Structures are given as structure tokens and as C-alpha cells.
Regions:
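Long, contiguous amphipathic alpha-helices that act as assembly "spine/axial" helices in icosahedral shell
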Residues: 1-64, 111-125, 210-223
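Sequence/fold signature of self-assembling virion shell proteins
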Residues: 62-106, 118-122, 126-251
């Protein structure tokens, strides 16, 4: 990504902020958005690794169908809203491989000299809305306490919504929405080694001046690839993600 500023002396006179500093920050923000979108695109790729033990369509495993589009039609707007029960089912799919070969390990997070193991759930804004409004267990603050060590960056910020049965729950409005019988979303329960990011060239920042520094261009550049990890067993299966589809009807 790149951005160019022209006639900086005049542009600076028309603003109350530093044009170059704000432009550089905006470029970095857009670069981060691109990275996030690429991670989500990789994790939500169903072309490989799709087995019943890594997918949950709504509240019950019985909604599974070998054809992905058909399975989506089994999700309804009443019984298949995201819930703590669905989070529990997804976690058990990860830990106890039924219709899959291997378990999914939780990710290990370093906390100073110690470490903790957690699964994480990225949930769409509409899915979280349904769980907050409809699931009494989630609303029970005695059960939905912030984990020990709440000063960690893992448990802060507006995206972090709480923890349930060893699963850290985060809001992610960029998860895909899919039109089916109703609108549904793909929430992601993630363990260790769900995806890989590989760089051929690490991120570099470049600056170029022209017209005696009246014009300035900034560029962020990298060579990288992001892919969901799929283990090649007798049947290929996703290595570290359970796909949790739920209702996501718009307001």
C-alpha cells in the first residue's frame, strides 16, 4: 500500500494536524486491516480440510451435510443463535476428535514467566448480540468473569467479551456473512497452529520525496503468504480451527 501527499506546504496550512504523521498512521492502519482480512480469508476457506469433526452448523451436529451449502440451509434464526452451549460443543469437537482424526491443542500464551493455555473464539457482532440477548448463562456475571491476570493485553480492549469454559471470546465484525435460508455467519474457534504466515520479505517502510520535498510518498511493502493449516491424513482436516456457523440476522 502507498499514499502520496502533494503540495505539502499548502496542505499543512489548511489543517490543524501534521499531514505527514497522520498519513503515515493511516497507512499503517490500512495495512493492518489488509492483514486481518487475509487471515480471515485463509481461515474461512472451505476448499480443503472440511470434515464433520471440524464444523458445527448451528446448535446441533445433526445439521451437518456433506455439501456445505446444504448444511447452511439447516440453520434457523431461532434455535441456532450463538450460545454458550454452542461454544461448549465446538470446544469438545476440538478436544475429543469424533469424525476427525486428531485433537486441536489450545494455544499457549506467555504471561511473564508463566504461561496459560486457551482456545479463542472470534465471533461476529450479530452472533454476539444474539448470545448477549438470549443466553442467560452468558449474562450471568458470576460465570463470565475476566480470567486471572486481567492486566494482560489478552483480556483488555473492546473486542474482548469474556471467557467461557477455557475459551476467550472476541468480537470480530469482519467475519463473513453468508446469505442462505437466513443470513448466517462463520465464527471461528481457534487452537494452536490454525494458520501460518510466511514472509519472503518482512514489512518495509519506504519514503520518497519529489518537487524539492513539496511532494512526499509513503509505502509499506512486504512479500508474504497466509494459509490455513490442513493436516494431510487419510482425509485432510483443518489442523487448528472449528468452524461455528450461527444465525446472524441483521438488526
Amino acid at each position: 500500500r502507498a499514499v502520496k501527499f502533494e503540495d505539502i506546504p499548502m496542505s499543512q496550512k489548511r489543517t490543524m494536524f501534521n499531514v505527514l504523521s497522520e498519513g503515515k498512521a493511516a497507512l499503517e492502519d490500512e495495512f493492518a486491516v489488509d492483514f486481518d482480512d487475509d487471515v480471515i480469508s485463509a481461515l474461512t476457506d472451505h476448499a480443503s480440510g472440511r470434515v464433520r469433526g471440524r464444523y458445527l452448523y448451528g446448535a446441533t451436529d445433526a445439521n451437518w451435510n456433506a455439501t456445505h451449502a446444504t448444511a447452511l440451509t439447516n440453520i434457523d434464526g431461532t434455535n441456532d443463535m450463538l450460545s454458550t452451549a454452542m461454544i461448549g460443543v465446538a470446544k469438545r469437537k476440538a478436544l475429543i476428535p469424533v469424525n476427525a482424526t486428531a485433537k486441536i491443542r489450545p494455544a499457549r500464551f506467555k504471561m511473564g514467566k508463566d504461561s496459560e493455555q486457551w482456545f479463542t473464539l472470534w465471533a461476529h457482532t450479530f452472533a454476539l448480540r444474539d448470545m448477549v440477548n438470549s443466553d442467560a448463562a452468558w449474562r450471568n456475571r458470576e460465570l463470565n468473569l475476566t480470567p486471572t491476570g486481567s492486566n494482560s493485553v489478552l483480556f483488555n480492549g473492546s473486542a474482548f467479551k469474556g471467557a467461557w469454559e477455557g475459551v476467550l471470546v472476541y468480537e470480530n465484525e469482519r467475519l463473513p456473512l453468508v446469505a442462505s435460508t437466513i443470513q448466517v455467519t462463520e465464527n471461528l474457534l481457534l487452537g494452536a497452529q490454525a494458520a501460518a504466515v510466511v514472509w519472503g520479505q518482512r514489512t518495509k517502510f519506504n519514503e520518497e520525496e519529489a518537487d524539492f520535498a513539496h511532494d512526499v510518498s509513503y509505502e509499506l511493502h512486504e512479500i508474504r503468504g497466509i494459509e490455513k493449516l490442513v493436516f494431510s491424513r487419510a482425509t485432510e482436516e483443518d489442523n487448528g480451527v472449528v468452524h461455528v456457523f450461527s444465525a446472524a440476522v441483521a438488526d
